[in-house]
Amino acid sequence: MAHDASAPRRFVKIAILTVSDTRSLDTDTSGSFLQQALEEEGHHLADRKLVIDDIYQMRAVVSTWIADPEVEVIITTGGTGFTGRDSTPEALSPLFDKHIEGFGELFRQLSYDEIGTSTVQSRCLAGLSNNTAIFCVPGSTGACKTAWNGIIRQQLDSTFQPCNFVQHVRRKSQ
Protein backbone atom coordinates (compact mmCIF):
# COMPACT_ATOMS: atom_id res chain seq x y z
CA MET A 1 0.00 0.00 0.00
CA ALA A 2 1.92 2.95 -1.29
CA HIS A 3 1.26 6.40 -2.58
CA ASP A 4 2.76 7.67 -5.80
CA ALA A 5 3.92 11.16 -4.85
CA SER A 6 4.47 12.00 -8.51
CA ALA A 7 0.90 11.16 -9.50
CA PRO A 8 -1.47 14.10 -9.78
CA ARG A 9 -4.15 14.16 -7.11
CA ARG A 10 -7.65 14.24 -8.55
CA PHE A 11 -10.65 14.93 -6.38
CA VAL A 12 -14.05 13.50 -7.21
CA LYS A 13 -17.65 14.64 -6.90
CA ILE A 14 -19.56 12.48 -4.44
CA ALA A 15 -23.29 12.17 -3.72
CA ILE A 16 -24.52 10.75 -0.41
CA LEU A 17 -27.86 8.97 0.00
CA THR A 18 -29.11 8.06 3.46
CA VAL A 19 -31.74 5.32 3.56
CA SER A 20 -33.75 5.56 6.77
CA ASP A 21 -37.29 5.32 8.06
CA THR A 22 -36.38 7.13 11.29
CA ARG A 23 -33.84 9.88 10.48
CA SER A 24 -33.98 13.31 8.88
CA LEU A 25 -31.07 15.18 7.33
CA ASP A 26 -30.78 17.07 10.64
CA THR A 27 -30.43 13.85 12.69
CA ASP A 28 -28.44 11.84 10.13
CA THR A 29 -25.09 11.40 11.89
CA SER A 30 -23.84 8.82 9.39
CA GLY A 31 -24.44 11.01 6.34
CA SER A 32 -22.95 13.97 8.20
CA PHE A 33 -19.83 11.96 9.01
CA LEU A 34 -19.42 10.92 5.37
CA GLN A 35 -19.88 14.49 4.16
CA GLN A 36 -17.30 15.83 6.60
CA ALA A 37 -14.85 13.02 5.81
CA LEU A 38 -15.03 13.45 2.04
CA GLU A 39 -14.66 17.23 2.29
CA GLU A 40 -11.65 16.86 4.62
CA GLU A 41 -9.99 14.75 1.89
CA GLY A 42 -10.61 17.51 -0.68
CA HIS A 43 -13.47 15.81 -2.53
CA HIS A 44 -16.61 17.72 -3.46
CA LEU A 45 -20.16 17.04 -2.26
CA ALA A 46 -22.29 16.84 -5.41
CA ASP A 47 -25.59 16.19 -3.62
CA ARG A 48 -27.02 14.73 -0.44
CA LYS A 49 -30.47 13.24 0.03
CA LEU A 50 -32.43 11.06 2.43
CA VAL A 51 -35.15 8.60 1.42
CA ILE A 52 -37.19 6.04 3.30
CA ASP A 53 -36.27 2.38 2.85
CA ASP A 54 -38.21 1.95 -0.39
CA ILE A 55 -36.71 0.18 -3.39
CA TYR A 56 -38.22 2.54 -5.95
CA GLN A 57 -37.29 5.75 -4.15
CA MET A 58 -33.70 4.53 -3.83
CA ARG A 59 -33.55 3.54 -7.49
CA ALA A 60 -35.01 6.86 -8.60
CA VAL A 61 -32.41 8.93 -6.74
CA VAL A 62 -29.43 6.71 -7.58
CA SER A 63 -30.44 6.35 -11.25
CA THR A 64 -30.60 10.14 -11.56
CA TRP A 65 -27.13 10.44 -10.04
CA ILE A 66 -25.72 7.68 -12.28
CA ALA A 67 -26.84 9.71 -15.31
CA ASP A 68 -25.64 13.04 -13.88
CA PRO A 69 -22.23 14.15 -15.22
CA GLU A 70 -21.65 16.03 -11.95
CA VAL A 71 -21.69 12.81 -9.87
CA GLU A 72 -18.70 10.46 -10.06
CA VAL A 73 -19.15 8.49 -6.82
CA ILE A 74 -22.24 7.59 -4.80
CA ILE A 75 -22.15 6.47 -1.18
CA THR A 76 -25.36 5.14 0.36
CA THR A 77 -25.76 4.51 4.06
CA GLY A 78 -28.50 2.34 5.53
CA GLY A 79 -30.79 -0.44 4.40
CA THR A 80 -28.13 -3.16 4.23
CA GLY A 81 -29.21 -5.24 7.22
CA PHE A 82 -31.75 -8.05 7.64
CA THR A 83 -34.81 -6.28 9.01
CA GLY A 84 -37.99 -6.52 6.99
CA ARG A 85 -37.56 -3.13 5.31
CA ASP A 86 -33.81 -3.28 4.63
CA SER A 87 -33.69 -3.38 0.84
CA THR A 88 -30.66 -1.43 -0.42
CA PRO A 89 -28.99 -4.49 -2.03
CA GLU A 90 -32.22 -5.46 -3.80
CA ALA A 91 -32.76 -1.88 -4.97
CA LEU A 92 -29.29 -1.06 -6.22
CA SER A 93 -27.57 -4.28 -7.26
CA PRO A 94 -29.62 -4.47 -10.51
CA LEU A 95 -28.27 -1.03 -11.47
CA PHE A 96 -24.62 -2.17 -11.40
CA ASP A 97 -22.78 -2.79 -14.67
CA LYS A 98 -20.07 -4.52 -12.60
CA HIS A 99 -20.15 -5.74 -9.00
CA ILE A 100 -17.18 -5.10 -6.70
CA GLU A 101 -17.38 -8.24 -4.56
CA GLY A 102 -14.16 -7.46 -2.70
CA PHE A 103 -15.72 -4.39 -1.09
CA GLY A 104 -18.25 -6.34 0.97
CA GLU A 105 -15.71 -9.03 1.76
CA LEU A 106 -13.13 -6.55 3.02
CA PHE A 107 -15.74 -4.53 4.94
CA ARG A 108 -16.87 -7.62 6.83
CA GLN A 109 -13.25 -8.56 7.58
CA LEU A 110 -12.54 -5.10 9.01
CA SER A 111 -15.86 -5.04 10.84
CA TYR A 112 -15.20 -8.40 12.49
CA ASP A 113 -12.53 -6.78 14.67
CA GLU A 114 -15.13 -4.30 15.94
CA ILE A 115 -18.38 -6.28 16.22
CA GLY A 116 -17.36 -9.92 15.96
CA THR A 117 -19.57 -12.40 14.19
CA SER A 118 -22.43 -9.89 13.94
CA THR A 119 -20.65 -8.71 10.80
CA VAL A 120 -22.15 -11.65 8.87
CA GLN A 121 -25.46 -9.77 8.91
CA SER A 122 -24.02 -6.92 6.86
CA ARG A 123 -25.09 -6.96 3.24
CA CYS A 124 -22.97 -4.00 2.17
CA LEU A 125 -21.99 -3.97 -1.48
CA ALA A 126 -20.41 -1.89 -4.21
CA GLY A 127 -20.44 -1.65 -7.96
CA LEU A 128 -19.76 0.43 -11.04
CA SER A 129 -22.51 1.86 -13.21
CA ASN A 130 -22.00 4.28 -16.12
CA ASN A 131 -18.47 5.01 -14.85
CA THR A 132 -19.89 5.86 -11.41
CA ALA A 133 -18.57 4.03 -8.35
CA ILE A 134 -21.34 3.14 -5.89
CA PHE A 135 -20.62 2.08 -2.31
CA CYS A 136 -23.53 0.87 -0.12
CA VAL A 137 -22.64 0.77 3.57
CA PRO A 138 -24.60 0.08 6.76
CA GLY A 139 -26.44 2.90 8.48
CA SER A 140 -24.55 3.06 11.76
CA THR A 141 -22.00 5.83 12.10
CA GLY A 142 -19.45 3.28 13.29
CA ALA A 143 -19.92 1.21 10.14
CA CYS A 144 -19.60 4.34 7.99
CA LYS A 145 -16.33 5.15 9.74
CA THR A 146 -15.06 1.61 9.16
CA ALA A 147 -15.98 1.72 5.47
CA TRP A 148 -14.57 5.22 4.90
CA ASN A 149 -11.36 4.90 6.91
CA GLY A 150 -10.66 1.28 6.01
CA ILE A 151 -11.56 1.19 2.31
CA ILE A 152 -13.26 4.10 0.57
CA ARG A 153 -10.83 6.89 1.54
CA GLN A 154 -7.86 5.06 0.03
CA GLN A 155 -9.77 3.86 -3.01
CA LEU A 156 -10.79 7.46 -3.80
CA ASP A 157 -7.20 8.68 -3.49
CA SER A 158 -5.82 8.96 -7.02
CA THR A 159 -2.26 8.56 -5.71
CA PHE A 160 -2.98 5.22 -3.98
CA GLN A 161 -1.12 2.33 -5.64
CA PRO A 162 -1.24 -0.20 -7.12
CA CYS A 163 -4.83 0.76 -8.01
CA ASN A 164 -7.75 2.93 -6.96
CA PHE A 165 -11.27 3.67 -8.17
CA VAL A 166 -10.51 7.20 -9.35
CA GLN A 167 -9.01 5.62 -12.45
CA HIS A 168 -12.36 3.92 -13.15
CA VAL A 169 -14.64 6.91 -12.70
CA ARG A 170 -14.62 9.39 -15.51
CA ARG A 171 -16.29 12.69 -15.84
CA LYS A 172 -19.31 11.82 -17.94
CA SER A 173 -19.28 15.18 -19.68
CA GLN A 174 -15.92 14.40 -21.33
Task: Give a label for each model feature.
Residues M1-Q174:
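Non-catalytic beta/alpha edge segments that cap or flank active sites
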